[in-house]
Swiss-Prot record:
Known role: Regulates mitochondrial small subunit maturation by controlling 15S rRNA 5'-end processing. Localizes to the 5' precursor of the 15S rRNA in a position that is subsequently occupied by mS47 in the mature yeast mtSSU. Uses structure and sequence-specific RNA recognition, binding to a single-stranded region of the precursor and specifically recognizing bases -6 to -1. The exchange of Ccm1 for mS47 is coupled to the irreversible removal of precursor rRNA that is accompanied by conformational changes of the mitoribosomal proteins uS5m and mS26.
Note: Involved in mitochondrial-nuclear incompatibility, a major determinant in reproductive isolation between species, through hybrid incompatibility of Ccm1 and its interacting partner 15S rRNA between yeast species.
Family named by the database record: Belongs to the CCM1 family.
GO molecular function, one term: rRNA binding
Highest rank taxon of the organism: Eukaryota
Cellular localisation: Mitochondrion
Protein name: Mitochondrial 15S rRNA processing factor CCM1
Annotated GO CC locations: mitochondrion
Subunit structure: Binds to mitochondrial small subunit 15S rRNA.
GO biological process: mitochondrial genome maintenance; mitochondrial RNA processing; mRNA processing; positive regulation of rRNA processing; RNA splicing; rRNA metabolic process
Keyword line: Mitochondrion, mRNA processing, mRNA splicing, Repeat, Transit peptide
Main location: mitochondrion
Residue windows of the PPR repeats: 337-371, 374-408
Length: 867
């Protein structure tokens, strides 16, 4: 006799408390002894089991479980995590079903019909003897001479099935004209990657084109679905649509305009000339509509059609094209909708036109509810606040968004955290509240983690490392950078198709922004300052979990072939300056060399050698042509051996700032000389070589005419050494960038930090030569003035710190004509003059600082005359 016992216990699966019932079935005595017969087993199976009534479960049965002890927040987080998992699982199932549907359709065989046909064949073959007395039949059991009326063979079933599937995507008329069901199914079955280009091209080859198809059918099955057309196929579609309306433009419908505009606006701009062709085509369509209006068309222009125009103009960053489409709204009497306003808003933000951006945003707020800003619009203006480092306005926008009922998502909180991090960079932008802003930024990060769990986006990681970097939290910054690089490397390698190209892999993995924040953390490190996250419990837990999740030794990374070892010191916390300098140099080289795939020290003589240089000389008519040819060779050299995405002035300046902040003058000078070169130095070497080469070529020609027997030896002797020197110099520039205004400003700051008059003098002289170069002269006038003003201010600050007040005052006096000196710029100089009681110099300085502009003088004169 079987005996059942039941008990209930709590089982935690995927964060849900689930009642789990277990059934305990004791073995029979015979089974335990092992001496049972087959009859005993048969009797056991045939014996009717006694049913036991199972009562329903109520909350009273759970007395042994204290549910109140469950953390409510943790339970809510687990529920949200389970919902997110369910959502992702549904998406995966949907994608899998789409792929399965594609495979089944591409087989062009209806399995159900095939089974029916196979059953028919089997029945005919098995009854072969019975069918002998009937009239002659073929091998499928189908009477010869009457096959179409009696049954359907396998080929007709396949064709019928593919025809039925093709008619799901196109009108039956078009399917018949195409006469290629396989093409239709191949191009349109996968709805996520439909390719309409072969379809439109094939339809255009038919004389009938789109004629004979009802308007409703045309709109629902073709015009509303066709997407991703190339420009030539858009032209074909437009031509067929004109033929469809018998070239009567008054019958050209709204759906036709919308389909053409949508495909035009989504064209990928691989060729610069293509953008002009697209704009011309859009204007041509609008001119066609204007002409149709004059003729009395009933077709209505819509906001959605014109939105494609402003979207494409926004993509081009072209103000003239944008204004053209905006005036069309007024011309047609169309009020822009929310989508139109948002597109224009994003365009102005991208172009850096802050005033117009805020005007558009305010207009959206004070129009109807249909025009009220949505989440996209709010996120767009928050990026504008980030650019302006205006954290107070960003907080106002965020609170306004919450009060209007819009739920700020992960992207919004990420932007807010980034804004607060950037605003905390110094006491001026943070208004003396740097730590408070970072603390508020971490609050947004905690909200993101509570919502999404441990799965953080790239933008969220960037905001986190920005907060840690400005706080000088090296331990957190290193861990975040390590997590980002290793995770992205694994994802890229796992999805890589074909033979692995590690240069391309690392180019997509290494992010210069993340590297810049890591270097910023190194430069802001202060051993006497406690990281902000260690000041409260939630921050301590977050920091500990992230740092402990990283294995700097790399042992856990090589469980498979996807592991990568970054050049970090095998410690969780760095405490010494020399460790920061060594690790920053290693990370910098690792990024420049594509993770070790290339080498800074390798020579690329195949790109630059003697013959290459002489060819450049012979092909250059002027010195400028020769410079251009050499620059192109340097660019080619860099692109093949160095990660040029990382080698830029922003990251390099942050890299150079590290030894300045850590008081290591020798390391700064080494880094400066190793990774920068001077424009005037490059010009002098190139010009002297070019002139010398031309002179030698002339001399060689003269010697060839006088003594041809010795001309060859002389030519080799003269051309050897200069070529070698220039080739080595060019090769040394492959990992260097041209020193610019910010480089000289940083050098002057270093001179002030190290109290080095020689370094300051060199920076002053080098920048004086740089001002005469073409690189500086090509800058806009306001940029040149801004750079001159900043460098002069740094010079005054340096001389004042060295108590060289006469030199500092001389800088102010010599530049007063083109620099508008303000008191904060010369405050230290004024204080120094007060200490030595130099009243004459004080009067001169204050006279320059307090002088009025010509406009102010004229205005005061006019006001005095009026009085």
């Amino acid at each position: 006799m079987l005996r059942y016992t039941r008990n209930y216990r709590l089982h935690n699966v995927a964060s849900s408390l689930i009642l789990k019932r277990t059934a305990i079935i004791p073995s029979l005595q015979g089974l335990r002894r092992g001496n049972f017969s087959q009859d005993d087993t048969t009797n056991l199976n045939n014996k009717k089991r006694r049913k036991r009534k199972v009562t329903s479960i109520s909350l009273d049965d759970l007395n042994s479980v204290n549910l109140k002890k469950v953390n409510t927040k943790e339970l809510e987080f687990k529920v949200r995590q389970l919902k997110e998992f369910t959502k992702n699982l549904k998406a995966q199932i949907k994608r899998s079903e789409s792929r399965n549907e594609k495979r089944e359709t591409e087989d062009d065989i209806d399995l159900e019909e095939i089974n029916k046909d196979a059953d028919s064949v089997f029945e005919n073959l098995s009854n072969h003897e019975r069918r002998k007395n009937h009239k002659v039949q073929n091998h499928l059991g189908i009477p010869i001479g009457n096959s179409q009326n009696q049954s359907t063979n396998l080929s007709s079933l396949i064709l019928g099935s593919s025809l039925e599937q093709a008619q799901k995507f196109l009108p039956s008329t078009l399917v018949t004209r195409l006469n290629d069901n396989n093409l239709v199914l191949k191009c349109l079955t996968d709805k996520t990657r439909q390719n309409w280009n072969p379809i439109i091209k094939s339809i255009s080859k038919n004389r009938e084109g789109l004629n004979g198809i009802g308007k409703n059918k045309l709109n629902s099955t073709l015009l509303s679905s066709v997407k991703g057309l190339y420009f030539d196929n858009i032209e074909r579609l437009d031509k067929m649509l004109l033929e469809y309306v018998d070239n009567d433009i008054t019958k050209f419908t709204t759906e036709m305009y919308l389909s053409l505009f949508e495909n035009l606006s989504n064209i990928k701009l691989t060729d610069p000339n293509m953008s002009n062709e697209v704009i011309v085509k859009m204007k041509e369509l609008l001119e066609r509509y204007d002409e149709a209006l004059i003729k009395g068309t009933d077709t209505k222009m819509t906001q959605y059609i014109l939105n494609n125009g402003i979207k494409f103009a926004s993509k081009l960053n072209n103000h003239e094209h944008m204004e053209y489409f905006l005036t069309k709204f007024k011309g047609y009497g169309i009020i822009p909708n929310r989508i139109n306003y948002t597109t224009v808003l994003q365009y102005y933000i991208r172009m850096g036109i802050s005033k117009k951006s805020w005007d558009i945003f305010d207009t959206m707020k004070f129009l109807s509810k249909e025009h009220a800003p949505d989440l996209i619009a709010y996120n767009s203006v928050l990026t504008l606040c980030s650019r302006d480092k205006d954290y107070s306005k960003a907080l106002d926008i965020y609170n306004e968004m919450v009060n209007s009922g819009i739920n700020p998502g992960t992207s919004t909180r990420t932007i807010m955290a980034k804004i607060l991090a950037i605003a905390s960079r110094d006491s001026f932008t943070s208004e003396g509240k740097s730590e408070s802003l970072r603390l508020l930024g971490w609050k947004f990060i905690h909200e993101i983690i509570e919502t999404t769990g441990s799965k953080l986006s790239h933008k969220s990681l960037e905001s986190m490392i920005a907060l840690a970097a400005y706080d000088g939290d090296v331990g957190m910054s290193r861990a975040l950078y390590h997590c980002y690089v290793t995770t992205k490397y694994r994802n890229v390698v796992q999805n890589w198709v074909g033979k692995r190209d590690y240069v391309k892999i690392w180019k997509s993995v290494l992010d210069p922004r993340m590297l810049n924040y890591l270097f910023l953390a190194y430069s802001n490190y202060n051993s006497n300052k406690l990281p902000l996250l260690l000041g409260y419990e939630q921050g301590i837990l977050l920091r500990r979990n992230i740092i402990n999740s990283v294995d700097y030794s790399g042992r856990s990374e090589f469980d498979d072939d996807l592991g990568v070892l970054l050049p970090f010191l095998p410690v969780t916390e760095i405490k010494h300056n020399w460790e920061l300098l060594a690790e920053s140099r290693a990370i910098w080289h690792f990024n420049l060399e594509y993770g070790g795939s290339t080498s800074l020290r390798s020579t690329s003589e195949s790109i630059v050698d003697k013959s290459t240089i002489m060819t450049a000389v012979e092909n250059s008519k002027t010195i400028d042509d020769f410079k251009w040819n050499i620059f192109s060779k340097i660019h080619e050299l860099k692109s093949q051996t160095i990660n040029t995405d990382v080698l830029n002035s922003i990251v390099l300046n942050t890299y150079l700032t590290i030894p300045i902040k850590l008081h290591d003058k020798k390391e700064f000078v080494l880094r400066l000389k190793e990774f920068t070169f001077q424009q005037h130095d490059f010009d002098s070497k190139i010009e002297s070589f070019y002139l010398e080469s031309n002179n030698k070529m002339v001399e060689d020609n003269d010697k060839n005419s006088s003594s041809p027997s010795t001309s060859e030896d002389t030519s080799i002797e003269l051309a050897e050494d200069p070529n070698d020197l220039l080739a080595h110099y060019i090769l040394s520039l492959k990992h260097k960038i041209l020193a610019n205004c910010s480089t000289y400003e940083l050098t002057m700051k270093a001179a002030s930090k190290f109290n080095d008059i020689k370094l300051a003098t060199e920076a002053w002289e080098e920048r004086g030569k740089f001002r005469k170069s073409s690189s500086f002269q090509k800058l806009a006038q306001n940029n040149r003035m801004e750079s001159d003003t900043k460098f002069a201010e740094l010079m005054v600050a340096f001389f004042s710190s060295q108590k060289m007040y006469t030199d500092a005052l001389h800088v102010v006096m010599s530049s007063k004509r083109y620099i508008d000196w303000k008191y904060p710029m010369v405050k230290n100089l004024h204080r120094g003059l007060l200490e030595i009681e130099d009243s004459r110099s004080i009067d001169i300085l204050l006279d320059i600082v307090n002088r009025k502009s010509k406009v102010q003088t004229i205005e005061e004169t006019i006001s005095s005359l009026t009085l």
